[in-house]
């Protein structure tokens, strides 16, 4: 067990490779990443046996920016017989189970990468899931409750119709979504599809049990670069009153809620109204990431907001390095003022050439 598979958006394999290499080295684990451009996944192979399992336990998954999922995997199973794919797959799981007790496993995902080529396998994967699940249950696996906070999900990751990896992820340190992708429905009354970015960000960064406490009708939000209102929509839906800052027009149905004030101003120059306590700042402006991170830092340092979600548009080259630089600069700015804070960042499914960042100031 010396390999990890990490899923990602196609085109971001090099960023995942750089990130997992960095994270592993911080734990004293060394290896190399196998990268195929636009494949939608990366294989990280550790030099020492059993270290992939350690990484899957000890690298906080919510701290990985570019990976959608992290699983410990077998060697590639090749040339599977179409008449009996299940037997060698079960045998591979049995080999893994010599090191990890699958009695606590609760779910099976038969997956592919998020590419057009791999999606041609999606129908097969869906049909293959039922017989494979039955075969694994005969081994005494997949019997735990899905709601438990320990144990594993089992994964069968097909890269071709006759080639797959088998593996597992830890329930307390993975994405619970199939293929690492949350399935969100576009609201019919939302002004733009960008609304799904903020919805996914809230689901990713804010624990469900805390959402009503941290986003509610007693709060005020500011949306910089708000037009036509995709992000404002998500705040208003949760009851916030929102100052929507943009020279462009906002959607009429948002005005109809009585929960927004349109401020036709430059997002970089806008300041919150005096005597108004702003709880949330959101920002999805197309601008250099260093300029956006400086703007967010100004809001936090001035005490203009307590919590923020914003996008950083990525450059064409050195994307991982630019992200780390921006996040480190923000952390230094806040630490120098003795502020207690938490930073999270993720390349969300609904992001493209950008990442989404969440910062919360703590008491």
From Swiss-Prot:
S-adenosyl-L-methionine binds at residues 194, 227-230, 246, 266, 284. One of its GO terms (biological process) is rRNA processing. InterPro entries: RlmM_FDX (IPR040739), RlmM_THUMP-like (IPR048646), RNA_MeTrfase_FtsJ_dom (IPR002877), rRNA_MeTrfase_M (IPR011224), SAM-dependent_MTases_sf (IPR029063). It catalyses: cytidine(2498) in 23S rRNA + S-adenosyl-L-methionine = 2'-O-methylcytidine(2498) in 23S rRNA + S-adenosyl-L-homocysteine + H(+). Keywords: Cytoplasm, Methyltransferase, rRNA processing, S-adenosyl-L-methionine, Transferase. Pfam families: FtsJ, RlmM_FDX, RLMM_N. It comes from the Bacteria. Catalyzes the 2'-O-methylation at nucleotide C2498 in 23S rRNA. Belongs to the class I-like SAM-binding methyltransferase superfamily. RNA methyltransferase RlmE family. RlmM subfamily. The active site is at 313 (proton acceptor). The keyword Methyltransferase applies. One of its GO terms (cellular component) is cytoplasm. The keyword Oxidoreductase does not apply. Its main location: cytoplasm. This is Ribosomal RNA large subunit methyltransferase M. It is found in: Cytoplasm. Monomer. One of its GO terms (molecular function) is S-adenosylmethionine-dependent methyltransferase activity. It is an enzyme of class 2 (transferase). Its EC number is 2.1.1.186.
């Amino acid at each position: 067990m010396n390999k990890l598979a990490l899923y990602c958006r196609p085109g971001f394999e090099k960023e995942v490779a750089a990130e997992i290499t960095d994270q592993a080295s911080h734990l004293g684990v060394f290896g190399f990443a196998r990268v195929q451009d636009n494949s939608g996944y990366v294989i990280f192979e550790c030099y020492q046996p059993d270290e992939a399992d350690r990484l899957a336990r000890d690298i906080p998954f919510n701290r990985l920016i570019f990976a959608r999922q992290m699983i410990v995997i077998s060697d590639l199973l090749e040339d599977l017989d179409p008449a009996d794919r299940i037997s060698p797959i079960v045998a591979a799981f049995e080999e893994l189970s010599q090191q990890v007790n699958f009695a606590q496993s609760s779910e099976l995902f038969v997956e592919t990468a998020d590419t057009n080529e791999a999606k041609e396998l999606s129908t097969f994967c869906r049909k293959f899931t039922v017989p494979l699940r039955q075969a694994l249950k005969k081994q005494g696996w997949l019997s735990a409750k899905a709601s438990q906070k320990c144990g594993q999900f089992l994964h069968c990751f097909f890269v071709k119709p006759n080639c797959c990896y088998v593996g597992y992820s830890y329930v307390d340190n993975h994405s619970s979504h199939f293929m690492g992708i949350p399935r969100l429905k576009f609201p019919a009354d939302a002004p733009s599809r960008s609304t799904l970015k903020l919805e996914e960000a809230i689901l990713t960064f804010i624990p469900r049990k805390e959402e009503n406490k941290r986003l509610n009708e007693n709060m005020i939000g500011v949306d910089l670069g708000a037009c036509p209102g995709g992000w404002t929509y998500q705040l208003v839906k949760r009851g916030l009153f929102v100052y929507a800052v943009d020279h462009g027009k906002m959607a009429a149905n948002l005005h109809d809620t009585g929960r927004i004030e349109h401020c036709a101003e430059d997002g970089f120059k806008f300041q919150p109204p005096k005597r108004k306590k702003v709880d949330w700042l959101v920002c999805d402006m197309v601008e250099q990431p260093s300029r956006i991170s400086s703007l967010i830092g100004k809001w936090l340092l001035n005490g203009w907001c307590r919590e923020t979600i914003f996008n950083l548009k990525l450059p064409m080259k050195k994307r991982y390095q630019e992200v780390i630089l921006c996040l480190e600069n923000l952390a230094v700015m806040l630490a120098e003022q003795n502020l207690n804070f938490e930073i999270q960042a993720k390349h969300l499914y609904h992001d493209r050439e950008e990442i989404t960042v969440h910062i919360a100031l703590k008491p």
